[in-house]
């Protein structure tokens, strides 16, 4: 019986030491810095920055944890997962000129119809690849401008007003849509938070 009590006391002491070891010295009760490094939900940020009509018509795509492309909103619900992955990999990513290894994280939305200039993207560049991302998105804008210049005047004006900016938070954003100034302001506010 005495041996059981000693054993129980040793277990209780070990548990107490384990709990004390879980604390951090100098803890202030404030969130740790890992909370500040929590990844941002770029898909949700794009969704919230644009109009309800755009959310209805244009999907927002990104790369899933499994390495395959995935999408939400717009017409994405009409696709099977493999079809969606193939369309994004073979059509949309080449339109944005984003290659593997350029982005640590991203979300984007594009029109693949040749009668509309529409492209939004938030890209967190991979280490040392910021200028590559800026160049890729600027090439997208230039392509849109060339496509629309002698075709559809209203869409050409949208492409001419497109913006590619590197934000203080490190993300590179592309805004090529109607009311681009408002969308850009919305993106900047959300990404600064």
What are the roles of these predicted feature ranges?
Residues 1-10:
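Bacterial N-terminal signal peptides that target proteins for export
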Residues 17-21:
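C-terminal motif of bacterial Sec signal peptides marking the signal peptidase cleavage site
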Residues 23-26:
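Bacterial signal peptide processing site
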Residues 36-91, 97-100:
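Early exported N-terminus immediately downstream of N-terminal targeting peptides
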Residues 39, 43-46, 120, 130, ...:
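Extracytoplasmic/secreted envelope proteins and their assembly/folding machinery
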Residues 112-113, 122-124, 155-193:
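A short, solvent-exposed beta-edge/loop patch
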Residues 130-168:
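Short Gly/Thr-rich strand-loop-strand
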